[in-house]
Amino acid sequence: QCIRTEQGEDPCTLYQLLSDDDGNPVAEVSVFRLPEGGRAAAGATVIVPLETLLTEQLRIAVDGGQGKLYPFSFCNPIGCYSRIGLTASDVEAFKRGAVARISIVPFPAPDQTVTLDMSLSGFTAGFDKVSVLNN
């Protein structure tokens, strides 16, 4: 997904719309590269529905692994945002993996977990082409 600009190169991110088992869109994920030399090799923005239980955080697990928890940054009328820093080893896991499972907990049903599958097919080729974003 690219943003058109008047001048220079259009910044692009890897984008995936995640749907539930019934085909309803539930979450959006955008992944981008970060400048070299920082603790994070890449960044990701995950947008989930309002009424997500924010204190339970967002979990991302690749190919059935334990996964990592990430806090939510803010909510607006569109949804709740988690802005994530991915380490070089996280990026390598995405490149080697087949599926990243993203899990959230709904506020109205705190005893349940909603798990969405993010395909990692083509991640390596796509990641190598996305823009380096400075923010």
Residue ranges and their predicted role:
Residues 1-135:
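A generic "folded-domain core" signal
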